[in-house]
UniProtKB/Swiss-Prot annotation:
PANTHER family, per database record: 39S RIBOSOMAL PROTEIN L18, MITOCHONDRIAL (PTHR12899), LARGE RIBOSOMAL SUBUNIT PROTEIN UL18M (PTHR12899:SF3)
Name of the protein this chain belongs to: Large ribosomal subunit protein uL18
HAMAP family in UniProt: Ribosomal_uL18_B
Superkingdom as given in the UniProt entry: Bacteria
Length: 118
């Protein structure tokens, strides 16, 4: 019997492999992305202290409306504004095992437009 590989399990394996290599610090925290079917979430995380410094998602009113890619761009811009307000200008981008395409790329582009460097 032929079985299809579970896409989410392979993504989680990729994410675990990458997380062993990258880590966020107070000077350069990690911008982590989580994508569900209907929403997208972004967090700026200091892994040394284990603290989330800023977060945004499509659950917030100002990030709703438009296509999913447009919403992702809005989330990227709002998380970047929150991070810059806390004097964070550089981050490490953690795509959480997702392909750098579609909503993940839109979020990254939105964050770059708002002034975050990675």
């Amino acid at each position: 019997m032929i079985t299809k590989p579970d896409k989410n399990k392979t993504r989680q394996k990729r994410h675990a492999r990458v997380r062993g290599k990258i880590s966020g610090t107070a000077q350069r925290p990690r911008l982590s992305v989580f994508r569900s079917n209907s929403n997208i979430y972004a967090q700026v995380i200091d892994d040394v202290a284990g603290v989330t410094l800023a977060s945004a998602s499509t659950l917030e009113k100002e990030n709703q409306g438009g296509t999913k890619s447009e919403q992702a761009s809005k989330v990227g811009q709002s998380v970047a504004k929150l991070a810059i307000a806390k004097k964070i200008t550089e981050v490490v981008f953690d795509r959480s095992g997702y392909l750098y395409h579609g909503r993940v790329r839109s979020l990254a582009d939105g964050a770059r437009e708002a002034g975050l460097k990675f």
